[in-house]
Amino acid sequence: MKVLFAVNNENISTLIVKKYQKEYKEIISYKNVYYFNAILKELQKDKSYDRIVISEDLEKFTNSNYQQMDKFIFDRLDSISDEASNLQGENIPIILICSERRAKGEEILVKLFGIGVYDAVIGKDRDISEVCNLLNRPRSKKEAKEY
């Protein structure tokens, strides 16, 4: 499996890969990028990724206005989801590790569901095991709606 990681700490992606490979006995090849625009560029260049893991706090915000931050995140993920398709034209699942402040049912999560981001990890699920589970088997639309 090939994974594009966009998390603000390389140790996180390394821990996820090690745990996944140990648990599922499958090798992961991966690349780390550190900006939202770098995700777009990488997806335009390489359509062979099987999964994308993005941390909501990938980039630091100078503004503490949550509405503006949510708009920025949504706009970036909207662009990324448009590019996130493989050579067969199928959507590449995006696993979003949400910030600590997120709660189920928030407007931004509903909007992300609308653009096909079904694998948001929030609250107590924000751990490496849950990310590994979603790497192995991303949520269906129905499962995401229930989550």
Task: State the predicted function of each range.
Residues 1-146:
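Long, basic/Gly/Ser/Thr-rich N-terminal segments
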